[in-house]
Amino acid sequence: MDSSLHQYLVNGGMDHFLADHFASILSRDPLILTEADTRNLNSSETNLFETLYGYVWNHVRFKPPTSDKGPGWRVEFRPMEIQLTDFNNAAFAIFSFLLARAIICFHLNFYIPIDLVNESGASCQKRDAVLQERFWFRRRDWSSNSDFINQKMSRPLQSKCQQHGDGEIYGLMTADEIINGEGTTGGFPGLLFIVHCYLDYMKAPEKERDTIEPYLSLIRDRASGISPTPASWMRSFVLKHEDYRKDSYVNEKVCYDMMRAIVYLFLLSNAVFFAVAMISYCYFPFQVHHIVHACTLKVDKDV
């Protein structure tokens, strides 16, 4: 990173963390740059910046305003893979949004060193990582002790979030512990607990919370292993299919039946489409064990 560029951004009013981010990007040479891009430069145009910034796609990506009339600063959350149903996609989108609002509202700090992020990134690529692997997470000093945070956080969260005097700031935790909490005195209460406290603080109407709860329940069940990941579900489907010969070759029949099961699973995941799915059953035939397999929530742990 160009330290002079970092200092220039700080002198312009940018905070150190954001200056680190942009200086590390702008210090690199662009992949493509034409002579026209360098002509008639002025502070009101963002074309050159977009050229430099457009080739960097981090997991969490800042999107600065493109003009005074367009949308303001935006943040893209990019690491999530596509889910099998709209309901599952909506669940992760809702959870990410509510957690982001809670972090901002309560001034929470979940920063961890980038080398630990990379180590966790390697762990999460392993098979059945949700249940079998552990990931680095900030276990201590993540909750502010300021009067501001004490006023905004509900009493249950304050009692659970007492700062530890001993122990490492960062620790290895399972996905279940990160999402649902460690379940021990003084342990991390879980990101879902923080989201619920945010909803309490915002005095979310009961009707809205009833609408949100099924989505948050999916996040809880996915982290605990009650609900399988799409990868686990697909592996289980293939292994149990009568045409799979345990030879690592997935033939067209297995793929076709899986896609039909996914469509049926999508229909069953939404109550609005449930009646349509039943009516269409005679035109969309499944073998019974495929339907049961598509709807089951449990898979073999060794898959």
Give the location of each predicted region.
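C-terminal accessory/tail domains of diverse enzymes
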Residues: M1-D302
